[in-house]
Swiss-Prot record:
This is Small ribosomal subunit protein uS15. Transmembrane segments: none annotated. Part of the 30S ribosomal subunit. Forms a bridge to the 50S subunit in the 70S ribosome, contacting the 23S rRNA. Keywords: Ribonucleoprotein, Ribosomal protein, RNA-binding, rRNA-binding. GO terms for molecular function: rRNA binding; structural constituent of ribosome. The gene is rpsO. One of the primary rRNA binding proteins, it binds directly to 16S rRNA where it helps nucleate assembly of the platform of the 30S subunit by binding and bridging several RNA helices of the 16S rRNA. The keyword Plastid does not apply. GO terms for cellular component: cytosolic small ribosomal subunit. The keyword RNA-binding applies. Belongs to the universal ribosomal protein uS15 family. It holds the Pfam family Ribosomal_S15.
Length: 89
């Protein structure tokens, strides 16, 4: 359940710091959040599959690490990103 090219481009355009920015923590966290939300919707009716759940846990942990990094580097960018994405932290 990966994101389409158009969805990725829209997310990158919305969260990038400068033109062509695809590697900033904000962009990476936004892409991971979209992937996590899409995978959660897929996993609701199918409760017996363990491999996608494992992938979901890996994505959540990776997003948490990126958010911890951003929180240590710049707390204002961190709090702005949390507010824009609607994450609980």
């Amino acid at each position: 359940m990966a994101l389409s090219v158009e969805e990725k481009a829209q997310i990158v355009a919305e969260y990038q710091q400068t033109a062509g920015d695809t590697g900033s923590p904000e962009v990476q966290v936004a892409l991971l959040t979209a992937n996590i939300n899409k995978l959660q919707g897929h996993l609701k009716p199918t409760t017996k599959t363990t491999t996608p759940v494992r992938g979901l846990i890996r994505m959540v942990n990776h997003r948490r690490k990126l958010l911890d990094y951003l929180k240590g580097k710049d707390t204002t960018r961190y709090s702005a990103l949390i507010g824009r994405l609607g994450l609980r932290r």
